Amino acid sequence: MAKINREKFPIGKVFISLSAVGTMVGSYVADWNETHIHNPTWPPHAKFHNAQTMSMGAALSLATLYHLWKPGRSRESLDSAAIIASVYGLTQLSAVLYPGTASVDPPREDNWPQLKYTLPSLGLVLVGYLTERYRISRKR
């Protein structure tokens, strides 16, 4: 079995990638169903914003992966990838600040079920970013 060189293996980039893929897949898993995009009680404009949110999750994830894995590694690319990877989760958390918002539709309890995914995802980005920064700084 091949031994992994920890100094060369970009585990931090893998952590950020896991967060990005989770965002891309998770937004569709959570919203492509009868409670969201296929909800007959939702007006077309609400579905428009839901579709926009799913597409935004995919676009941010693809941009993250591009900046993370493109040739010519750099600290700037890592910084960009980490910021982009965090945008979806941070904006999701900010939704509570807007009037009349709820984390779920009635009759379900508004207990922010998204937090069990959003906080670990942001944690992966943070740990991945710090780990990769450390790895890059040791290579110099």
Annotate the PLM regions.
Residues 57, 81-97, 119-124:
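Hydrophobic alpha-helical membrane segments
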Residues 64-78:
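Juxtamembrane helix-break-helix junctions at the cytosolic face
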Residues 123-139:
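Membrane-water interface at the C-terminal end of transmembrane alpha helices
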